[in-house]
Each structure stands twice: as C-alpha cells, then as structure tokens.
Amino acid sequence: MSDTNKQVRVRFAPSPTGPLHIGGVRTALYNYLFARKMGGKMLLRIEDTDQNRFVPGAEAYIQEALAWVGIVIDEGAGVGGPHAPYKQSERKPMYREYAEKLIAEGNAYYAFDTSEELEAMKERLKAAKVASPSYNMVTRMQMNNSLTLPEDEVKRRLDAGDEYVIRLKVPRKEEIRLNDMIRGWVVVHSSTIDDKVLLKSDGMPTYHLANIVDDHLMEITHVIRGEEWLPSAPLHVLLYRFLGWEDTMPQFAHLPLLLKPDGNGKLSKRDADAGGFPIFPLDWKDPASGDTWIGFKQQGYLQEATTNFLAFLGWNPGTQQELFTMDELIEAFTVERIGKSGTKFDINKAKWYNQQYMRQLPDETLTRLLKEEADKHQAKYDAAKLPLIAQMLKERLTFAKDYWIEGQFFFEAPETFDEKVASTKWNAEAVTVISAYKEALAAYTGEFNAENVKHVLHEVLEKADVKIGKIMQALRLALTGAGAGPDLMQFIEIVGKEEAIKRMQFALITLSEKVNS
C-alpha cells in the first residue's frame, strides 16, 4: 500500500468525451480539498484513450470548469510537470511495454478472436442459460488466444500482423481484498471478474491498464473517484500485484453516487432537462448536434456558492456550519466524513447557497449587478440612487437577474396590479386614504425623504381615523403593482414626489371599479 510518509499526490482524470458533469466537478473538488488538507499535489490527467468518443473542445471545457470552481491544478494537462505528457494518447508506447511484461510473466495473453467469434460465444452462453456471458477464466479456454493456440501459431499470427487484443489473465479461485477509505474492506472472488481487455487492437490501452500505469509512474498516493469504478477496483488491485507495484498501490476512496432529486437512481442529463436545472458547471454547445445546455455559472450561480453546494453533496463537517470559504473547506475536510450512500441532488439547496452568498457580496458589486440588469432592460435611472436600491433588494435575491424581477417597479411604473391583493385590499376606505395621501404629498413642500413622507401618511391616517395596517398593502399595490416588497417609504423617496403621485393617480383610475364591484 501507499507509503504514509510520502507527499500526498491525487489526480483528477476525466475523459474528453463531452462536457464535465457536475458529479465530475464534485470528484475533482474532493480530490483538491484532500490534497490541500494534506499538503499535497493535485494533478490533472486527460484520459483520451477512446478516440472514437473524443469531442473537440471538451478538454478546454474541463480546464475552464475546474478553474471556475476554484480548483488550482499543481501539475498536469495545461500546466506541465515532471511526468509529462499528461494526455494518455501521447503516452501510448509505454502502455504496450507493460502489457507485454504481463504476458511474459503469465498474467496476460494475446486474444485473436474476431467480433463474430465473440458474438457466437455470447450466444452460446445465453443458450446455456448463463446470466452474464463474458470472456473469463472458463470461456477463455474455448477461444482463439495464446492460451489455447500452439506457440508457433501465436508467433505466426503476430508476425503476419493479425489483429489481436491483450487480455488480463484473472487467477482462479482467489479472494481479492481492498480496504476502501470510505467503505472499509471490499472482498471479491476472482470468479466474478472477467478477463478485461488491457490493450486494444489499435494499440491504445483501455482505462484499466492506462490508469494503473499512469498512477504508478506519476506517484499517485490516493485515488478518489466515483462509485461506478468500485466494481473495477479488484481488477486494479490484481494489476498492481502483477506489475510488482503492490507495495506502492495508492489508497482508494470510492465516492457515493449523485442521485436524482427524488432519490430514485443516478442523476442524469435527462433529469436536469426535465427538472429545468443545470447539470454542467458552464455553458456547453455540442459541436456535432448544435444542442446547448446552460451551466451553473451562466444561470447565475456564484462560484463560492457552487463550490459550497458541491462540497456538501456526500460530505458534511459534523457541525451546524453550512457556509464555508474554500480555505475553511480545506481545513474541515476529511475523507472519513464522506458518506457511503448516494446523495440526492437538491437544486433548491443550491439556490439557498446562492442566496446566502449573494447577500454577502460587497455593496459595490451588488450595485454593479443591479446596473447591469437595469441596462439589459434599457431602464432609465439616477445612478446615485442605485446603491440604495441594491441594498433594499438584496434580501430578495437568489440570482443577479432577480434584481429586475424583484425591483422592476423602481424603474418602471406598474401597468398591471396583483389581482389577489386588489380583490382583498382595494376598497372604498383604501381609495379615500390613498386619494388624500396623493393630495397631501402634492401639497407638501418640505424635504422629500422617507421619514417625511411617512409623517405625511400618518397625518392623513389620523385625520381619516384609519390604522396603517388596513391600507398599507393597497398603497403598496398602487405604487408598485404588488402586495409585498421593500420598505415603502424609502421606495417613495427613491422614485420621487412626481412619480409617486402619478402612480397613485393611475391606480385610483385603473382600480376604481374594484370599489363598485
């Protein structure tokens, strides 16, 4: 096993077959937090052995996504380092060397089977009621490979350039044990493992061989990856042993699955599409189909909120604290506090995190975001009043775009009114008070500020013998079109005397039929 005195080295090793799923970002984040906590290094390796599934732009997307959530790569693709190259397609020659070593020592073999022969084998096993037909320790002895063919025939085929793959020779009747950092001891019998292909006919390695060779050569001490790789872990343990690297084998930690919001099954792109929430960190456009998906960033999620949300998808600090800076996450993070069972993907929790972080933004940032939203809608405004509006609305924000959704009435007079509020709060008494208030404001000649317009309102209410609570929603309705919102007196100060009077007059005319109905 890995030497506990060595510097911790972890890697994130995605395949450039499309955009990086948010679950992949979580895996990268856990690797990063662990490396930083242990004073170690974080590597990025691109596992592009499957050239048929390679997608242009995917590698750049991966690097941009990791940078956006605050992950700093110490070594690897895009950075360089002593173990370059960090793309598996550029390391192709070295994998053959290790595959041939496995053959020479009796732990792998050449397999010359055609696709037709492989299909015939599967059909034969299905007919014999074998539940999961596979190329394994039993069926390999009935196939065309270097275990069944004479040595001179194998040599002839190799010399002739016949197509072949190299398969792992899984031992018979053996228990393979793995002590996972999250799940504890995992014990698998070798009879359940098939003879996986290690080197494909095009000379490219499969994931199983390439990741073992690269992890060893890059001195990886801990492999933190998704639960979907747990069934392959015993196979990887065998490879470490067969290659003579058992003593330096990294420690494994297999992360719990990200589940659908209802908890029934693994989270997928289809679930995100159906639920109307993002599943990729950044916008993505498929270069083949032209289909597009919006990312967390472009939907308005802040980097800090997204990172915090992802950290809690399977891990918890064991305290009541929920908001963490990256440095605080690093300090608190331990693999031992990662759960074994799958975690529901709760987009409402992601929104909650964004709300908290929006409220913590500096005043100048909030003002800038408000200005950007107002400019998008070509609104007219007094720039000097924007900081106050930004502060008044910040408690109502989930995303920056909510500045317009929640505060459009600061910039534009309402043309429609909340029907529910109008039907319950707009009555003869409200009309009398609002009419009187409109006239009182028109006659008022003092400084027009929140405190003074409130004083004028109280004078009107006292004369009419009406409690403020009875007409406040109706007054807000007249001024903003809604029944709830920020401080109304401050609002009146911001829009100004002339605009406030004009809005009340419009409401009195437009809603007058409510009184008579």
Swiss-Prot record:
Localization (cell): Cytoplasm
UniProt keyword annotations, A-Z: Aminoacyl-tRNA synthetase, ATP-binding, Cytoplasm, Ligase, Nucleotide-binding, Protein biosynthesis
GO biological process terms held by the UniProt record: glutamyl-tRNA aminoacylation
Catalytic activity, reaction form: tRNA(Glu) + L-glutamate + ATP = L-glutamyl-tRNA(Glu) + AMP + diphosphate
CDD domains: GluRS_core
Entry binding sites for ATP: K269
Motif ('HIGH' region): 14-24
Pfam families for the chain: Anticodon_2, tRNA-synt_1c
Motif segment ('KMSKS' region): 266-270
Group of enzyme by EC: ligase
GO cellular component, one term: cytosol
Keyword Repeat appears in the UniProt entry: no
One GO MF term: zinc ion binding
EC number: 6.1.1.17
Record NCBIfam families: gltX_bact
Function: Catalyzes the attachment of glutamate to tRNA(Glu) in a two-step reaction: glutamate is first activated by ATP to form Glu-AMP and then transferred to the acceptor end of tRNA(Glu).
Subunit structure, interactors included: Monomer.
Entry's family note: Belongs to the class-I aminoacyl-tRNA synthetase family. Glutamate--tRNA ligase type 1 subfamily.
Name this polypeptide is given: Glutamate--tRNA ligase
Organism for this UniProt entry: Cytophaga hutchinsonii (strain ATCC 33406 / DSM 1761 / CIP 103989 / NBRC 15051 / NCIMB 9469 / D465)
Name of the gene: gltX
